[in-house]
Amino acid sequence: MRRNEYTHRRRHISNRHLSDKYYYAGEHETATGIRLTQYNEQSLHTKEVRITDTSFSKLSDSDQIDWFEVSGLTNADAITRIVKDFGLHNLDAKDILTPQHVVKVEEYKGRMLIVLNSCYYDVNNEMRSEHISILVANNTVITFTESNNPVFEAAHKALLSNMLNIRKKGSGLLLAFLLNTIIANLVESASKVEEILEDIEE
């Protein structure tokens, strides 16, 4: 246990300095997995992506919207490869791999990276925190989460039902749905905490 704690502390400290390589500094042990959802007005399909794929950007289809869901940040090398494959930098990978990072939005030419933290209630009605990053590169959206909990299930349902003609629109509307899901989770969590506090006061 002490060795694990020391390793966690060492990795957390290493992410504070400039480096060619960073590590996931969180507590989740979820193995990194990648799911790709591609859609347009006529079709929608989802598949698993191998982490060993040499180029993730080549999996994108310019005629569709491509949504890569990266669940689990333990494979820091894969996270870094994805980030660099879409034209970002090692420091951006560092932000993605560092939970409780200050909320930030980085804009590059044709790309944007959003880093934030959220919380939600799981199926067991327990509050969970989640470090989330969203990378947008033209028609490609990549979400990074610490766990494989269905944080963006509402967005998937919107795609399946084609809510607000989402499959006809660009990646901007998908981003809006993802951010709306995060905000909804925060509002729900705040409401439940408020109810708990009111019960305690009574």
Role assignments for model-derived ranges:
Residues M1-E202:
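Peripheral, non-transmembrane regulatory/ligand-interaction domains of membrane transport proteins
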